[in-house]
Regions:
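Single conserved hydrophobic/aromatic residue that forms the stacking wall/gate
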Residues: 163-166, 170-174
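Signature of N-terminal electron-transfer/Fe-S-associated modules in redox systems
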Residues: 2-165
Length: 174
């Protein structure tokens, strides 16, 4: 009975917006990290690799900034806007995914969600980066399959920049 009481005392209620949907009155263990919590809610695109913040597979956007969900407690996300790979704008993500496929930047798929989240953040920053800057920005995402060259090519692909800028402009007009 003492274990049940301890378990109850270590839980709290939080609310957040995940992929533009309100999630209110969610019960969470105070020591559970955001990555596990998101997966429990059904957001399986957030992969958990090292669970130490090194591999980048668990990247999500918290209030539009990239965060390692294995290093953030779910309670720290209370009141925040969370975007997982499933919540990225589908038309924009199709362009990014097409660039990854075209440049052979996807292999086993384990790092893909983290890479796509980082790529999305890079491209949406409204700035064109050099290859070295791209390498630096994706350096926090481990990929054991591609050797990174193809990923840099995909991120740098002018098609992604051109189409995302056009899509953004159309959205701003409407």
């Amino acid at each position: 009975e003492g274990i049940k009481l301890m378990s109850y005392l270590n839980k709290t209620t939080i609310s957040m917006v995940i992929n533009n949907e309100n999630y209110d009155d969610l019960t969470v263990e105070t020591r559970q990290h955001l990555g596990d919590f998101l997966r429990e809610l059904g957001f399986k695109g957030t992969h958990l690799g090292c669970e130490q913040g090194a591999c980048g597979a668990c990247n999500v956007l918290v209030d539009d900034e990239s965060v390692r969900s294995c290093l953030m407690l779910a309670v720290q996300a209370n009141g925040k806007k969370i975007t997982t790979v499933e919540g990225l704008d589908s038309s924009e993500m199709e362009i990014v995914k097409d660039c990854f496929v075209k440049n052979n930047a996807m292999q086993c798929g384990f790092c893909s969600s983290g890479m796509l989240m980082t790529t999305y953040e890079i491209i949406k920053s409204k700035r064109k980066y050099s290859r070295e800057e791209i390498r630096e920005m994706i350096s926090g995402n481990y990929c054991r399959c591609t050797g990174y060259q193809a990923i840099v090519d995909a991120v740098e692909d002018p098609v992604s920049y051109t189409h995302l800028r056009a899509h953004e402009t159309e959205a701003d007009i409407v």
